[in-house]
């Protein structure tokens, strides 16, 4: 049988999602815990591989097993055998043609900036910090130039292995919640560092270095060297993954923390 899981994790202490030799990864910790519950080696497939220091509230994985367990065993059992900064949020049996990555129709990320003169203490590893003034309205205006099917070469990491830089960006909203500026972005898929590179460029607009129209020029230039610096990893969250309704996956609050599902 095939089981899908919803996963939440704080990526601070991990070298990214993907299992690697000699370093800690979220995937490795999850697979070890699931293997204990299943009493056989378990290998998971994920919706999206996040980089070192990046967090997730809406990661989705699937794995195959021939053992019969109640769904609560996969949630409670896995959580009992994992570090406290990783948690299974839900479990559901799915058809054999479900695939966490290839069945997904869209991914959604949120980037959180603590916009205050002084750095945060409690949330220091869960948000990015920018001390100067940011105009979130101009950042939002700039972001609208990126909507639709576009070549995102200007926002693509130099070592990105994707065969194509083209992606369909479905929405990009920038909102302020007190001292927190949130960039909410959804696309069918993302090239490597795309969200963080877009964020770095929007910050240049927000602090008045560039006008909103600069983002349109940057997109058309297709040159990573012209864009802003890559924003830090700690502010980024994979918050949601869309799948066809036929799979009937659970809907849970995407967060993180206090943030509602819809930001206006």
Swiss-Prot record:
Its EC number is 5.4.99.12. It catalyses: uridine(38/39/40) in tRNA = pseudouridine(38/39/40) in tRNA. The keyword Membrane does not apply. GO terms for biological process: tRNA pseudouridine synthesis. Gene3D superfamilies: Pseudouridine synthase I, catalytic domain, C-terminal subdomain, Pseudouridine synthase I, catalytic domain, N-terminal subdomain. Keywords: Isomerase, tRNA processing. GO terms for molecular function: RNA binding; tRNA pseudouridine(38-40) synthase activity. Pfam families: PseudoU_synth_1 (PF01416). Substrate binds at residue 109. The active site is at 51 (nucleophile). It is an enzyme of class 5 (isomerase). It comes from the Bacteria. SUPFAM superfamilies: Pseudouridine synthase. HAMAP family: TruA. Formation of pseudouridine at positions 38, 39 and 40 in the anticodon stem and loop of transfer RNAs. Belongs to the tRNA pseudouridine synthase TruA family. Homodimer. This is tRNA pseudouridine synthase A. It comes from Vibrio parahaemolyticus serotype O3:K6 (strain RIMD 2210633).
């Amino acid at each position: 049988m095939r089981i899908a899981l919803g996963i939440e994790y704080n990526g601070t202490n991990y070298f990214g999602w993907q299992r690697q030799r000699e370093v800690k990864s979220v995937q490795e910790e999850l697979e070890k815990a699931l293997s204990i519950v299943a009493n056989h080696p378990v290998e998971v497939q994920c919706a999206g591989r996040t980089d070192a220091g990046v967090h997730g509230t809406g990661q989705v994985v699937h794995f195959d097993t021939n053992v019969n367990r109640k769904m609560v065993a996969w949630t409670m059992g896995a959580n009992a055998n994992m570090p406290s900064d990783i948690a299974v949020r839900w479990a559901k049996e799915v058809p054999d043609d479900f695939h966490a990555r290839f069945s997904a129709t869209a991914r959604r990320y949120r980037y959180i900036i603590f916009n205050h003169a002084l750095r945060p203490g409690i949330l220091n590893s869960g948000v990015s910090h920018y001390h100067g003034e940011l105009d979130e309205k101009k950042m939002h205006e700039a972001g609208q130039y990126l909507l639709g099917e576009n070549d995102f070469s200007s926002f693509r990491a130099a070592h990105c292995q994707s065969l194509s830089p083209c992606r369909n960006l479905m929405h990009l909203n920038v909102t302020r919640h007190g001292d927190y500026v949130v960039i909410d972005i959804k696309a069918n898929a993302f090239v490597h560092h795309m969200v963080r590179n877009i964020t770095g460029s929007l910050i240049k607009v927000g602090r008045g270095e560039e006008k909103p129209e600069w983002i349109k020029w940057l997109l058309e230039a297709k040159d990573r060297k012209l864009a802003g610096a890559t924003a830090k990893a700690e502010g980024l969250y994979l918050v949601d993954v869309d799948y066809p309704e036929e799979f009937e996956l659970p809907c849970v609050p995407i967060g993180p923390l206090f943030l509602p599902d819809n930001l206006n």
